[in-house]
From Swiss-Prot:
This is Enolase. PANTHER family: ENOLASE (PTHR11902:SF1). It comes from Geotalea uraniireducens (strain Rf4). It catalyses: (2R)-2-phosphoglycerate = phosphoenolpyruvate + H2O. It comes from the Bacteria. Catalyzes the reversible conversion of 2-phosphoglycerate (2-PG) into phosphoenolpyruvate (PEP). It is essential for the degradation of carbohydrates via glycolysis. The lineage of its organism: Bacteria, Pseudomonadati, Thermodesulfobacteriota, Desulfuromonadia, Geobacterales.
């Protein structure tokens, strides 16, 4: 009864008004799964290929009708008749059908849409929530959220170099309390920014995007907001950064335009981070070095890797092969997991398993171009990741993931687990 009878893709819009792909998979029993594919702004060069049409006369060249056609005309014929519960088999079938390293023939967006819709259809078939279907009976840990409350870099039209300034309500007793704390700090930050005469418009991920005097001022106003909301920085709430350094790196030099000394070598940039870590309760830095600056990554890991979580995003692009190379070289101690960087659920789960075995933490992440799809919320609980990064406390494309986690926490009830500060097991070596 779990045989696939139909697969259908359509073009929809993401949170930035750009086209993306939505896929529906129907089963013989009448069960159905629907999945929408996200899209990134700052992307790693080794990410799986997001197939766009390139027709400048339509959606400025960003249409995805080619990917839609690849699902409806090519992939559908191959997977119809297969059992939806055979996730690995279906994903392998699509990988073989594409035959390229970065899924450039069919498009990672086409493949991922089908992969996730299949999992959702199978979950619907057996009457389980998606997190239960993927994770089994041991899926019970609600993630500590990284909440992006000030946006900069490629995610905002302002003068802030660092792409994301985040809060982590690590002192919360459960996910619902963590969400409340984050929301209260978000509103306090708006008041702090207004009082200083700063713009309170928001960026792609729902965080505020003011022009500030320096990158450090972003940390200062966040600290003020945490205190204003009635919480203690470093005790109730920790800080995290996503620098997106590949966007700042050219000809062996990092350029932070909003700093007194804009151009920095890798060593000088690590000095900059170390100074911030000494002054503020920063627990995590993502993409602190450019994706191809492996020497810089090694130095940063050696200097800061026992004090803070060092997350590889553009560095690893959710790719098990690249992650293994990083593990072997002792680079970073955490991986950001983005479904569309690798393009199938199976490969995503492989990367998570590899990271955990190596003692690396995993952070399940959204993209800056999101939809109302809440798969990543379920995924974070399914694999007991312990951390999730899904934007600020406004914009429905971000909040829908938080709301799904509230539902899951309710459903798990007494068996729900929330570890708070204990999620940073990579710092206990």
């Amino acid at each position: 009864m779990s045989q696939i009878t139909d697969v259908y893709a359509r073009e929809i819009l993401d949170s930035r008004g750009n086209p993306t792909l939505e896929v529906e998979v129907f089963l013989e029993s009448g069960a159905m799964g629907r999945a929408a594919v996200p899209s990134g702004a700052s992307t790693g060069e080794r990410e799986a290929l997001e197939l766009r049409d390139g027709d400048k006369g339509r959606y400025l060249g960003k249409g995805v009708l080619k990917a839609v056609a690849n699902v409806n005309d090519i992939i559908a014929d191959e997977v119809i008749g297969m059992e939806a519960t055979d996730q690995v088999g279906i994903d392998r079938k699509m990988l073989d059908l594409d035959g390229t390293e970065y899924k450039s023939k069919l498009g990672a967006n086409a493949i991922l849409g089908v992969s996730l819709a299949v999992a959702k259809a199978a979950a619907d078939e057996v009457g389980l929530s998606l997190y239960q279907y993927i994770g089994g009976s041991n899926a019970k840990e609600l993630p500590l959220p990284m909440m992006n409350i000030i946006n900069g870099g490629a995610h905002a039209d302002n003068n802030v170099d660092i792409q994301e300034f985040m809060i982590m309500p690590a002192g919360a007793k459960n996910f619902a309390e963590a969400l409340r704390m984050g929301a209260e700090i978000f509103h306090a930050l708006k008041a702090v920014l207004k009082a200083k005469g700063y713009n309170t418009a928001v960026g792609d991920e729902g965080g505020f995007a003011p022009n500030l005097k320096s990158n450090e001022e972003a940390l200062q106003v966040i600290m003020e907001a945490i205190t204003k909301a009635g919480f203690k920085p470093g005790e109730d709430v920790l800080l995290a950064l996503d620098v997106a350094s590949s966007e700042l790196f050219k000809d062996g030099v990092y350029t932070l335009e909003n700093e007194a000394q804009p151009q920095k070598t890798a060593d000088q940039l690590i000095d900059f981070y170390e100074n911030l870590v000494n002054k503020y309760p920063i627990i995590s830095i993502e993409d602190g070095m450019a994706e191809n600056d492996w020497d810089g990554w090694k130095k940063m890991t050696e200097r800061l890797g026992k004090r803070i979580q060092i997350v590889g995003d553009d560095l690893f692009v959710t790719n098990p092969r690249i992650l293994k190379e990083g593990i072997d070289k002792g680079i970073a101690n955490s991986i950001l997991i983005k479904l569309n960087q690798i393009g199938t659920l199976t490969e995503t789960l492989d990367a998570i398993e590899m990271a955990k075995r190596a003692g690396y933490t995993t952070v399940i992440s959204h993209r800056s171009g999101e939809t109302e799809d809440t798969t990543l919320a379920d995924l974070s609980v399914a694999v007991n990741a312990g951390q999730i990064k899904t934007g600020s406390l406004c914009r429905t494309d971000r909040v829908c993931k938080y709301n799904q986690l509230l539902r899951i926490e309710d459903e798990l009830d007494a068996v729900a687990l929330f570890r708070g500060k204990e999620v940073f097991y990579n710092l206990k070596k």
